[in-house]
């Protein structure tokens, strides 16, 4: 793909766009004027991409999943048409073009539209539920598509193993460690179904936390099954509804209708601090800070050690990437597109307003967020949202695509206007 550098787009060059009808109170401008002018000129000047490097056929109901250099297409079951579900695997070559040949296909009789696909070690996992039963996980051999095992529950990576969470009925939930190759259970623990959360590391879950309304919190090692700590964090108090989330070294407990936040050390369950915020939805690491996100939008950046609010932003509701002291944040946009900006992580100051893009896919630490937006004449701009550089770089302009795109560190996949999907390798 050709690389077109737009240069820096700074906050001070982003006045309110004209002729935009008023929306909700407080909704600011989202598209920097300089970026808009540059993209308009690119629509006529940038070279149109050649036909798709690779193509695969697909129905309108087919869902695609990228994993490194593999592509998986999941076709849900269609009972009225007499079709069962199907999973198809493709390998995406490093070079070349044209239609891809499937590596393998395997039937999925109960596959649904909400199922998901993930790869762990040498197995492909299809996870989801059906209207008449609990969630299930089905494992296939990555190389051949041969069925390895099937079991109930939600599934997540945990180092070399997998964790499954089974809920439902009157019984407590059960978290089990499963061998990815065989599906055999190594160990399991019973936990409260409505009060079990997990701490996520780059290689998967490493802590299981049960924090029921009684206040008796238990923490397990998700790799060994050993119980690490048990403590009553509300001694002498009556049971009160709470929800919790683990972020790095902290266990964050939210009470009083999502207004009071208490932080504990996850290792010792020692109380660190307590603050009051408005209607907290969830938390996430923001570099050295802790970010809290509101149920109705907006975010707070908190000092991890004290809980003090370092800064607040009302426009943004999600952080996608933090890198080199800068954060890529997402806010409300229009249609399938969201607004994006780069903030200084320490102060919340806007470094660059990147305008509106459709961004999807995974964002590994060494990867890069990729956005798409309509150009004209059935074309799409493809751009890298450069966090460290504080700018947007248009990588290419694709023709004959309708959107429904996703990207990982190396590949971009979009639905083609003529049917099926196109796959492109991203420029460096």
For each of these PLM feature ranges, what is it?
Residues 1-428:
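Secretory-pathway ectodomains
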